[in-house]
Amino acid sequence: MTKSLYLTAAEGNVGSVAIVRTVIEELKQRYTNFGVFRAFTNGPIEHDIAFKDALDAAGLLDELDIAWGSTRQAFVADEEESMTELVKRYTDYSHGKDAVLILGFLDGDPLTPGMLPRTGRAAANLSTTVALMLSGALRSGREIEVATRLSAAEMVKEHAPVCVALVSSAMEDLELSKPERYITFTDGEKTYLTDEEKAKLQAAMEKESEVVTPLSFQASLISRARSDRKRIVLPEATDPRILQAADELLTREVADIVLVGDAEQINAHAAELGVDVSKARIVSVDDPELNEKYAVEFARLRQKKGVTLEQARETVKDLSYFGTMMVHMGDADGMVSGAINTTAHTIVPSFQIIKTKPGAALVSSCFLMLMEDRVYVYGDCAVTTNPTPEQLAGIAVSSAETAVAFGVEPRVAMLSYSTGTSGKGPDVDAVVEATARAREMNPDLMIEGPIQYDAAVDEAVAKTKLPNSPVAGKATVFIFPNLNAGNIGYKAVQRSAGAVAVGPVLQGLNKPVNDLSRGALVEDIVNTVAITAIQAQA
């Protein structure tokens, strides 16, 4: 994983030129593949003198065109779009780097209202910690610490942790109550660090942010998928969104893409859209060799259902069946479909062909709920209508495994309208039984149930209702008792809390197949392909 640090001025005239050069000199010696990235530029990048000076110090002037995120003007005009572009460009730039120093506000940049909160949001979305630059000129140690606390508080409000402060023009006899948090520059032209200061900088660089924003999580999906590229088949190549997503996935090297359809038509459609899918493999359902290979295998799999070879030949010409057979036969590592077809049309072939993996009680689904600063897992919100206690236990175990696969520590809450022993009745009994069975299936699983949603997420409520529970108040995986509750629940949180719902992610299959909403955006398709690729890596 790429190490990073967001270095930014907390005020004007902090002597950033000397500080930045000193930090770069140390980091480029410590990391073999080191990068410098400018979050926001002042107008055209070629006019950003401070950034060009930093790149020159790092010996990276040849990266000028790719080592920046957005412009300040674009950010003011449309923060959401600009932030998305920043994260995307940083994700691409940092790919393959050992460490990246991200530069925020520097001397000479306009000090505009909201500078620090904006910087904090950028750092949080880049999933990095912050190093503040301040001036120590004519300031006592206490005054510097007050200024640091005030600036850091602005950052923390935006979920960006500050781990070190670099102070220029500091007095020789400066007294700080917490010197371990500071690197001081008494000489404005200082270009070296003591061993102790190097250790502080190294600790800041190595410290990982625990905050996960929707943008940073989606960026992590891309990075993880890239780390071990998989072949993902997209059988609905007639849809323009699929071709646009394929272009982005191939350009960013997220996955190797297989498109199903007529090559001439697909390439002509791509040309009309202005996208490039030349690196994709294109296969046809009418390919005689593939059709026969898949038909023979499908007939074998379904012979007990009375499927003949002739029937199989026709069945595997269906896009969903063809794509699923590609995955089953090892010609692709996963499939994403549903932009045109219904959920049933997408997933029924996988039930018939790929089937459940060993130990999985059933195929179920979950949503990755991207909250403001963390990720939750909700299941089952899309597949299993009225699960039995045993099936509910299986959903809990599978959802916990999905959580682990996507970097979420699973603490499972088996949701109900009551907590602990406060409620009675068949609905509560079912959750009690499901919780017990889940513990049998995975004795190491942190799980609590029955539990109400507020007791699962609110530590104050948890202390009253379940004071000794390792899950209550800290749950990350939420299992709803049935599809009715689950679907309502995820949509309520999505709409009311502004959460980004990624999914549904199918779980329990031998090989990954995932379904798209028919209203999916290109971004949704890209994310789902990345998720499928990560599942295929397991």
Regions found by a protein language model. Give the residues of each.
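Flexible phosphate-sensing "switch/lid" loops adjacent to ATP/NTP-binding sites
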Residues: M1-L215
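Anion-binding alpha/beta catalytic cores of soluble intermediary-metabolism enzymes, centered on
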Residues: V211-A472, V477-A538
